[in-house]
Amino acid sequence: MAGARQAVGEARRIVVKVGSSSLTTAAGGLDADRVDALVDVLAKMRGADKEVVLVSSGAIAAGLAPLGLPRRPRDLARQQAAASVGQGLLVARYTASFARYGVRVGQVLLTSDDMSRRAHHRNASRTLDKLLAMGAFPIVNENDTVATDEIRFGDNDRLAALVAHLVRADLLVLLSDVDGVYDGDPSRPGTSRLAEVRDMGDLAGVDIGSAGKAGVGTGGMVTKVEAARIAAAAGIPVVLTSAVHAADALAGGDTGTYFHATGRRSADRLLWLQHASAPQGALVLDDGAVRAVVEGRKSLLPAGIAGVEGDFAAGDPVELRDGTGRAVARGLVNFDAKEMPRLIGRSTRELARELGPAYEREVVHRDDLVILHP
């Protein structure tokens, strides 16, 4: 464990995610003192010659008071209105706080749709790299004004994991109002903090849902553990801790929960396919094709397709489903949906003779495919 914590202290490029609950007052508004305390820690990291990207929630919380809202509204329209007003205030607060250290900030607003569109994905990566190279401090947020998934489900945790992979981070730090994952409700006596998670099997039997609840935000412990799973599977270790203990955690101290990296760093597009892409349709596979794709890691051929759903274009991400409707894989399809009816169930050799050599190929190549359920 000591070696793992030492690796935290030695990480050079770090993504830090902070939730609304760590930036707000008891009444739910933005707390300038808490923002300044976080910036003090982040600025010190930059001074130690580290590159840091901040993924920050808080736009909705910052917009509550200016709009006369006593608490986070439940209806989507007012949530988005609060986000629209609050995002500017949130960035202004960060700008003023970082100015104490002579550091400029750069705002990057993303949505799940941006991460799903490959061109946007590449541009976001280049922008973040350039901001870091030019000495600016990137502050990323889900675009709450239009990103309904984030507002409803607290998707900034997952966004942070994807950003960590996007910028090839050495470490992801998730800051919350709870000091790590506990084996029960941390407010009750007798519960213990889990110092490390070597693989997700270590959490079997742990009631993650009781280990922390967000107030003005939406991302509870469940979404944070899911974000840790995504990052760890992509080869990025994760520290989940309280914002109060951020400095100690980033220095490699024994605080929070450390998630060991469980996988190798994968190609950007594979993580994007598995966790960020929005499927534009589905291909239903027969039993033989399911075995070939899932167990044999083979490409999907027309002969193994039993049905087509949705209206997709060549190059779009689609789900591959078994006969029960379960999504077993996801991949980039090589044909438009309108072409599929004349292809399904037929051999590539037969299609090449009838339609030409362009049709003697896979519907989904194995290099453009990720398995969801082995």
UniProtKB/Swiss-Prot annotation:
GO cellular component, one term: cytosol
Keyword rRNA-binding: no
Keywords attached to this entry: Amino-acid biosynthesis, ATP-binding, Cytoplasm, Kinase, Nucleotide-binding, Proline biosynthesis, Transferase
MF GO annotations: ATP binding; glutamate 5-kinase activity; RNA binding
Enzyme class: transferase
Pathway, per record: Amino-acid biosynthesis; L-proline biosynthesis; L-glutamate 5-semialdehyde from L-glutamate: step 1/2
Pfam families for the chain: AA_kinase (PF00696), PUA (PF01472)
GO biological process, one term: L-proline biosynthetic process
Cystine connections: none
EC assignment: 2.7.2.11
InterPro entries: AceGlu_kinase-like_sf (IPR036393), Asp/Glu/Uridylate_kinase (IPR001048), G5K_ProB (IPR041739), Glu/AcGlu_kinase (IPR001057), Glu_5kinase (IPR011529), Glu_5kinase/COase_Synthase (IPR005715), Glutamate_5-kinase_CS (IPR019797), PUA (IPR002478)
Binding site for substrate: S57, D144, N156
Coiled coil: none
Listed SMART domains: PUA
UniProt entry tagged with the keyword Cell membrane: no
Binding site for ATP: K17, S176, D177, T218, G219, G220, M221, V222, T223, K224
Residue ranges annotated for the PUA domain, each copy included: 280-358
Annotated catalysed reactions: L-glutamate + ATP = L-glutamyl 5-phosphate + ADP
Subcellular locations according to the entry: Cytoplasm
HAMAP family linked to this entry: ProB
Record family assignment: Belongs to the glutamate 5-kinase family.
Job description of the protein: Catalyzes the transfer of a phosphate group to glutamate to form L-glutamate 5-phosphate.
Protein name, UniProt field: Glutamate 5-kinase
Species: Streptomyces coelicolor (strain ATCC BAA-471 / A3(2) / M145)
Source taxonomy: Bacteria, Bacillati, Actinomycetota, Actinomycetes, Kitasatosporales
